[in-house]
Amino acid sequence: MNFTNLEQYLNNGIESLVKDALRKTLMNPKETAFLVQYGLSVKKAEALRHKTAQRGGHIPSFLIASITSQCNLNCAGCYDRVREAPSVEEEMSREDWGRVFTEAAELGISAILLAGGEPLKRADVLEEASRYASILFPVFTNGIMLDSACVNFFEKNRHLIPIISIEGGEILTDARRGSGVYTQTMQAMKSLKEFDLLFGASITVTNDNLSDVIREETITELEEKGCKILVFVEYVPVASPSLALNDAGRTLLEERLASLREKREMILVSFPGDEKESGGCLAAGRGFFHINAAGGAEPCPFSPYSDTSLKTASLREALQSPLFTKLRENGALIGEHTGGCVLFDQAEYVQALASNP
């Protein structure tokens, strides 16, 4: 798939998500008003990206930003704890992130996924993000810190959308995240529902929980809690290879999601499974890239190698970095893609490219 076709694919994906969200929030005037306004911003962003494409460049439609490595939980097999995380002192400042958000808006980037660690530990960065209404900021949180003040903040800034991470039901969630965590996340969802906020859930899919998380009962329970978005993230085998889905598991997940999309009101997203339709991996700026807490521009969260820092470089410079350019041009991202993480399987190769720009 060339960049022209890819641009249209990504644009169509964002427009489809906005239309789905509008349809699912018609009974909520505040949410509908926000989504209509955001839909206009999406069109303007598409026009900006198209201008760049006409000049032979390419701007991805979204970014992933891990704004902190700090966390209030100690989940079993946590990817962020396996990798060498930056210290608090090394993390990007509010001003650093503000510069990134400003340039993202100017380039036509429509969404920035905020992750961690626990992103709610960086209230200063969330406050900074609230200033950029043209960008959608899904905030991937464990939900423990979602107190009344935090819910009020999200109510006032509806372009920041809480996405609460769970592992499925109570037994599975507490087994990985700690006793009592599931109850606290359900209470957080209750609070968000009381404010009629658009929010979602994120589930890391493993061989252990696959059969549970794709059950009708699981989806129904989340819908009843007020959840409008459900993101399925395939487990990347950083700690326990046996937990990673095999081809049969990925096929089952794909088939169940196709069935659920036909009859459910939820917005259902699979990552990286949905990338298959784009002709390959979207990392390294092809569809997105990852910014770690210290500012390193990485191909994706599961390929933690960088040759460029956003503390000193611009987003445009990061997109044109030697590492990203080589990955996009040498075929490492393109071709048959059947789920899982393409670059994780090429870790040594990516690391070598980053070390030898």
Q: For each of these PLM feature ranges, what is it?
A:
Residues 2-149, 157:
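Conserved alpha-helical substructure of the radical SAM core
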Residues 1-10, 174-284, 293-298, 307-310:
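Radical SAM enzyme [4Fe-4S]-AdoMet core and its adjacent flexible, acidic
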